[in-house]
């Protein structure tokens, strides 16, 4: 018996024993059979990445076989998703990526904390956070920083994350970057947000972009690439932060310089950020889940 068959048998037995009203799947290997299990529960699928980067199968591949496999795999996935009672995605932007589906519901990730204090936005410090990987685009951020650090030599850029920093250390040396600190991940990011005056997200793509919301909850305005998917749902451009065309490092540098040089605007955006981001507060998001559960159990359309 293969691993998939064994998993199906055990999951089916567990659901038959538990008899849940609702089963929520994170759409791993059970996506191929979850809706066929006869345990009586409503089936919800929840996706924590966006469609364009789901398992990286829909990237533009030069290999014809890979392209064909990606299309066939996505066609099969959509067929299974249609059978779910509800399919939950993290952003309105990603909802639009699934035009074949009529059962899509947007429920964003909740903020993991409520900040009782806020940054005064006086420190000359810019912060970014995430794994040291291609996805997070720190190479693009360093390129932008090369256009900022000499213009504002009293400002610092601190990046916090896990992973191999070698690529970024090489770029920092190549571009002779000043006041750049490639930090390790820290368990106390809340403190780092409070020490910051600007938060930057340089990701090429995201599932949502929770670090943006976290920084905003601390009263820190964010500058972010308008990458798929999440930042455009979180940041209200020009009100509580600034969006930049994805991958455009010149524009990223311009927007960061703008907030550095306009203290009053920076502080006004910070105040609005900590208010606007409360739509992602835990109690708000949990109420959306409760409403979804109740509607499914009551047979209410939504």
Model feature map: region roles:
Residues 12-13, 51, 66-87:
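Membrane-proximal helix-turn-helix segments that form the acceptor-binding/catalytic region
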Residues 25-30, 47:
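Short His-centered aromatic/hydrophobic patch
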Residues 93, 110:
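Carbohydrate-associated surface elements
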Residues 124, 128-147, 250:
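A conserved mid-protein helix/loop that constitutes part of the nucleotide-sugar donor-binding site
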Residues 168-186:
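Nucleotide-activated donor-binding/catalytic signature segment of Leloir-type glycosyltransferases, i.e.
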Residues 204:
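Aromatic "clamp/platform" in nucleotide-sugar-dependent glycosyltransferases that forms part
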Residues 236-238, 242-249, 257-264, 278:
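Conserved acidic donor-binding segment of nucleotide-sugar-dependent glycosyltransferases
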